[in-house]
Amino acid sequence: MLRIYAPASSANISVGFDTLGAAISPIDGSLLGDVVQIEDIPAGFELESAGYFVRKLPKEPQKNIVYQAYVLFSERLKLRNGHVKPLRLTLEKNMPIGSGLGSSACSIVAALVALNMFHNEPFSKMELLEMMGELEGRISGSIHYDNVAPCYLGGVQLMVQSLGNICQQLPFFDSWYWVLAYPGIEVSTAEARAILPKSYTRQDVIAHGRHLGSFVHACHTQQDVLAALMMKDVIAEPYRESLLPNFAEVKQASRDLGALATGISGSGPTIFSIAPDLAVATKLANYLENHYLQNNEGFVHICKVDNQGTRALG
């Protein structure tokens, strides 16, 4: 039996729409992510679901993304004259769906890594990552890797999609704390994509290029002040903020409390605030708990970048 944990991820990081993503873990050691357990059975295939958010999963097993991961893995293995073993997959759904924290990516990545390890790793990391992107595209409507890549590989990942690589890891800032606030409401990725304009002004395109280029440069040269200043979003945030509760007010208040940057995590409704130290992070967490959460399913976590990525649990 194997138990595979896949951590939450924050895509875009404001400045890198569909291009940047970070794996995230709470500093208190709690597991913010999904777990997939895989084990032998005498014959056939079984899928079970558990976890806090299990009630949010599709009722039909065929619509469960873990089932779809199993089917895709089986198809790819057959192309290599291989066959899947009789097995049971159990998804522990600990991540809220439509949260902006890579919930679907957690399930996809944990399932595919579990299946690959269970079958003695017939697929390389890049082959698995390509499968992960394909499955993610079925949910959101377009293939993108900014959640699955950091969730799988850890760290902050830049999508390059050239020279045989889907992504490359960016050096980042170990001193930064990420305060993540999920309000307890759902925003579908497809809905959040549909709200974006079909085209952008030249001014916005230039600004986006300047911000992203400067941010990547700042990461490589370890200029934390410049990196934080460049965490601006002219592509998605102006259009998506209407889907989030009191976003403009919360963003300004977070800045007043000492946040280096605040933005939408993925397609929302989770937001993130970057804090320079734990004292500021604690202030931000307290504020967001009282002013951003909408119901008792919401939560706030003080986090750091998770450099391990997906891993087996003991």
Curated annotation (Swiss-Prot):
Gene Ontology CC terms: cytoplasm
Subcellular location as annotated: Cytoplasm
InterPro entries: GHMP_kinase_C_dom, GHMP_kinase_C_sf, GHMP_kinase_N_dom, GHMP_knse_ATP-bd_CS, Homoserine_kinase, Ribosomal_Su5_D2-typ_SF, Ribsml_uS5_D2-typ_fold_subgr
Pathway annotation from the record: Amino-acid biosynthesis; L-threonine biosynthesis; L-threonine from L-aspartate: step 4/5
Reactions performed catalytically: L-homoserine + ATP = O-phospho-L-homoserine + ADP + H(+)
Name this protein carries in UniProt: Homoserine kinase
Keyword line: Amino-acid biosynthesis, ATP-binding, Cytoplasm, Kinase, Nucleotide-binding, Threonine biosynthesis, Transferase
GO biological process entries: threonine biosynthetic process
Entry EC no(s): 2.7.1.39
HAMAP family: Homoser_kinase (MF_00384)
Top-level EC class: transferase
Any GO MF annotation of the entry: ATP binding
Recorded family membership: Belongs to the GHMP kinase family. Homoserine kinase subfamily.
Gene3D superfamilies reported for this sequence: 3.30.230.10, GHMP kinase, C-terminal domain (3.30.70.890)
Major location (coarse): cytoplasm
Pfam family, one: GHMP_kinases_N
Species classification: Bacteria, Pseudomonadati, Pseudomonadota, Gammaproteobacteria, Pasteurellales
Residues involved in ATP binding: 96-106
Primary role: Catalyzes the ATP-dependent phosphorylation of L-homoserine to L-homoserine phosphate.
